[in-house]
């Protein structure tokens, strides 16, 4: 039986770099909110223990794809703890709408959806806490997608506090470039000492993103996208880019600006939601 699972985008409504650990990882404070927009995973259970990705990504070996890695990780851990029914496997395909290197969390969201969906379909019975712990081994952003609620994140992004920011409408624009996260985090001019603040203080301040100055400097397309969008509404970078976004109180206001978007921008309008569309499906 084929099943369909949302794999939503996220926005970093703010992102501040508060330090760098001895292992090279950066500590941060960020606010995650989901979008009612994203990829869709199609999963059909198999009964021969095989994992097949039917929609390979150009330039990425299947076994390196986060979708396959997440499936194999769940299979391994559930098997070792005696919670994997014999023969559990899956055929997985993806309808991809989220750009790679866009700062929307596409790969992390895909991995989280696989963990949540296969845990359900295989009836492994792992808790959300267990799935989030597995997810963290795949990427720092995976746990927030596994938990499925908007959150204030600290540490390297793994310390999550559920929050309920206003659910605005957003115009999200991709300027046609892919930004690998290390390009931003390795830049010597990246701000790395923004003072840590409480969530209550941060929610009262104007939101910004410490990575934005580097992304604008190194990628003229990002600079051009923000320059255009700022003419209409407060706008900023999400994650390490390349996507930028502006917030609006109504869908109609966002769509009016979308109609003005230049042809070189790939833009869409979506609602910010505090409960992930993936978890809404499970209710």
Curated annotation (Swiss-Prot):
What keywords were assigned to this record? Answer: ATP-binding, Isoprene biosynthesis, Kinase, Nucleotide-binding, Transferase
- Please list the GO terms describing molecular function: 4-(cytidine 5'-diphospho)-2-C-methyl-D-erythritol kinase activity; ATP binding
Disulfide bridge partners, by residue number: none
State which pathway it belongs to.
Answer: Isoprenoid biosynthesis; isopentenyl diphosphate biosynthesis via DXP pathway; isopentenyl diphosphate from 1-deoxy-D-xylulose 5-phosphate: step 3/6
Q: Has UniProt tagged this entry with the keyword Isomerase?
A: no
Q: Which reaction does it catalyse?
A: 4-CDP-2-C-methyl-D-erythritol + ATP = 4-CDP-2-C-methyl-D-erythritol 2-phosphate + ADP + H(+)
Which positions bind ATP?
Answer: 99-109
Question: According to its UniProt record, what is one Pfam family this protein matches?
Answer: GHMP_kinases_N
Say if the entry is tagged with keyword ATP-binding.
yes
Catalytic residues identified in the record = 10, 141
Q: Which GO terms describe its biological process?
A: isopentenyl diphosphate biosynthetic process, methylerythritol 4-phosphate pathway; terpenoid biosynthetic process
Q: What is its EC number?
A: 2.7.1.148
Q: How does it assemble?
A: Homodimer.
Family of the protein in this entry: Belongs to the GHMP kinase family. IspE subfamily.
Describe its function: Catalyzes the phosphorylation of the position 2 hydroxy group of 4-diphosphocytidyl-2C-methyl-D-erythritol.
Protein's name in the database = 4-diphosphocytidyl-2-C-methyl-D-erythritol kinase
Give the source species: Salmonella typhimurium (strain LT2 / SGSC1412 / ATCC 700720)
């Amino acid at each position: 039986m084929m099943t369909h699972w949302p794999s939503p985008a996220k926005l970093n409504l703010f992102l501040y770099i508060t330090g760098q650990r001895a292992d090279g990882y950066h500590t941060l404070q960020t606010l995650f909110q989901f979008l009612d927009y994203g990829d869709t995973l199609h999963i059909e259970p198999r009964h021969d223990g095989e994992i097949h990705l039917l929609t390979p990504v150009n330039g990425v070996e299947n076994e390196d794809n986060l979708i396959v890695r997440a499936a194999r990780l769940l299979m391994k851990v559930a098997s070792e703890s005696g919670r994997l029914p014999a023969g559990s496997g899956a055929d997985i395909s993806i309808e991809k709408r989220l750009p790679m290197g866009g700062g929307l969390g596409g790969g992390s969201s895909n991995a989280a959806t696989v963990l949540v969906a296969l845990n359900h379909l295989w009836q492994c019975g792992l808790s959300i806490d267990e799935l989030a712990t597995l997810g963290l081994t795949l990427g720092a952003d995976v746990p927030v997608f596994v938990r499925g609620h908007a959150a204030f994140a600290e540490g390297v992004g793994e310390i999550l506090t559920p929050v309920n920011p206003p659910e605005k409408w957003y115009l999200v624009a991709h300027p046609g470039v892919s930004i690998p996260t290390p390009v931003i985090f390795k830049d010597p001019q990246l701000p790395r000492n923004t003072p840590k603040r409480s969530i209550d203080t941060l929610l009262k301040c104007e939101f910004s993103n410490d990575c934005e100055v580097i992304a604008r400097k190194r990628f003229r397309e990002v600079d051009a996208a923000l320059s255009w969008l700022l003419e209409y509404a407060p706008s900023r970078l999400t994650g390490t880019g390349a996507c930028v976004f502006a917030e609006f109180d109504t869908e109609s206001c966002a769509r009016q600006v979308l109609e003005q978007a230049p042809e070189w921008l790939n833009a869409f309008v979506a609602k910010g939601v505090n409960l992930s569309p993936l978890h809404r499906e499970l209710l």
